[in-house]
């Protein structure tokens, strides 16, 4: 379980201090698929970065199973991140000079796992994400959707308890986005991995179980899916319209 308690984030510019996040309190249960939405500049990615240990809060705590992760020393934090967290970014972050097979395997290679175990895991995940025939290819030979599925396979190969995804469909066309989101949804259920995803897109968010809305650095509201994605999408759109801003701020 992940808990965020009284989290604040500020930045200083000359003599001025700007609040990015203010008094954030949040609890994420194991196995949940949560989206974070909000207007541009609301603090979505900053919150994601703090929860994923990429950034630190100015005040407040982030707990994973009652452990204050931001109190860990550098080596301990690196080990914790390696063992518990996976990342998916909008721009894939694949290594162009490595094959798809090697890109997926990289976290296990770094962890000094046995080669035969690595190969077994790579092939299993490549089949799951529908990219097995591309294992000997290189990133430049794949479409954006295929590259993002490679990134997703790499993110989960270490069996993390939680995956953070920052605008994972932002560079994809609608067909590729749907394919990736179906994979993430199935991955969430099959592997019981928690997913926290930042997105500006209502269609993308409709694949999650719960949506948290941030506005002006504060948690604004939350809605839960009833299990019907089309109904959830309509619910999201209605809420965006009622939040006092233009829908275009979010989409």
Regions found by a protein language model. Name each.
Residues 52:
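Helix-to-loop junction immediately C-terminal to a conserved catalytic motif
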Residues 60-68:
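Conserved ABC transporter NBD signature motif
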Residues 98-105:
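Short coil-to-helix segment of the ABC ATPase nucleotide-binding domain corresponding to the Q-loop/switch region
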Residues 138-142, 146-148:
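Conserved ABC ATPase signature
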Residues 157-161:
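A short, proline-enriched helix->beta-strand linker immediately N-terminal to the Walker B motif
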Residues 163-166:
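Catalytic Walker B motif of ABC-type/P-loop ATPase nucleotide-binding domains
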Residues 218-242:
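Conserved beta-strand-loop-alpha-helix hinge in the C-terminal portion
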């Amino acid at each position: 379980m992940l808990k965020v308690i009284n989290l604040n984030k500020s930045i200083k510019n000359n003599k001025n201090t700007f609040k990015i996040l203010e008094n954030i309190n949040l609890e994420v249960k194991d196995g949940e698929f949560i989206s974070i939405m909000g207007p541009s500049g609301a603090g979505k990615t900053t919150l994601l970065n703090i929860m994923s240990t990429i950034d630190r809060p100015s005040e407040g705590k982030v707990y994973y199973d009652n452990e204050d992760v931001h109190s860990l020393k550098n080596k301990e934090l690196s080990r914790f991140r390696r063992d518990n967290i996976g990342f998916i970014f909008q721009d894939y972050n694949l290594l162009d000079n490595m094959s798809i097979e090697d890109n997926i395997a990289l976290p296990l290679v770094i962890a000094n796992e046995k080669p035969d175990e690595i190969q077994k895991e790579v092939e299993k995940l490549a089949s799951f994400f529908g990219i097995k025939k591309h294992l000997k290819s290189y990133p430049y030979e794949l479409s954006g959707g295929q590259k993002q599925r490679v990134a997703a396979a790499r993110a989960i190969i270490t069996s993390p308890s939680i995956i953070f995804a920052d605008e994972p469909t932002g560079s994809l066309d609608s067909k590729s986005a749907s394919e990736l989101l179906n994979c993430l949804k199935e991955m969430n259920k099959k592997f019981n991995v928690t997913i926290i995803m930042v997105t500006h897109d209502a269609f993308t968010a409709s694949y999650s179980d719960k949506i948290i809305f941030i506005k002006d650095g504060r948690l604004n509201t939350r809605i839960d899916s009833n299990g019907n994605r089309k109904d959830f999408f309509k619910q999201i759109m209605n809420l965006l319209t009622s939040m006092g801003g233009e829908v275009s701020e979010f989409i």
